[in-house]
Regions:
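Positively charged, amphipathic and often flexible ligand-engagement surfaces
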Residues: 1-182
């Protein structure tokens, strides 16, 4: 706790605003992510979603990360498109919240497990292909250690190119080492 206490803050507190102001004054932008792993129930998922939406309403918050597994409980592995539709319904309000400001707040779609890779990419590309989000710059995280990451990167690069050709905003692809190198 001592080692990371300077990195963990209450998402609604004055300490967060002080840290965000300090970072901005030093030329930094902080990526905020509510703590917690995959949610176990719908009440927890809706709570996480609402807390993220409220966080994005803070004018000092310019960058936030969210995982599909944190906003929708018990995704059905046999109904990928159904999962994606449910997730898009849940995430649209967050992306709309991000677009209310100028410049827009940045939302980074994160994922941690291999089982979420293809769903997350499909969710990200479908959501950002919707007309209302064409001008929203957003990002996605790829775990470098996953066997399908290179192909996923190529898919996302093609999507980004086609999106720009249609007049859309750019996307950011963040490649990370990954925490699960076991």
């Amino acid at each position: 706790r001592q080692m990371v206490s300077h990195l963990v803050l209450d998402a609604e507190g004055k300490a967060l605003n002080a840290k965000l102001t300090e970072a901005k004054e030093q030329g930094y932008q902080l990526n905020l992510n509510l703590l917690g792993e995959a949610v176990l129930g719908e009440a927890e998922a809706k709570s996480r979603l609402e807390r993220t939406r409220q966080m994005l309403q803070n004018p000092l918050v310019t960058y936030a990360s969210i995982k599909a597994s944190s906003v929708c409980a018990q995704l059905n592995p046999w109904d990928i498109q159904g999962n994606i539709e449910r997730l898009k319904d849940r995430l649209r309000p967050l992306y709309r919240e991000a677009m209310k400001r100028s410049p827009h707040a940045f939302i980074n779609m994160d994922m941690e497990e291999y089982k979420d890779l293809h769903l997350t990419i499909k969710l990200f590309t479908e959501l950002l292909s919707e007309e209302e989000f064409l001008n929203l710059e957003a990002g996605i995280v790829l775990q470098a250690y996953l066997p399908d990451t290179f192909e996923a990167f190529r898919t996302l690069a093609t999507f980004a190119k086609e999106r720009r050709e249609k007049g859309g905003a750019q996307i950011k692809i963040r490649l990370v080492k990954g925490a699960n190198l076991s």
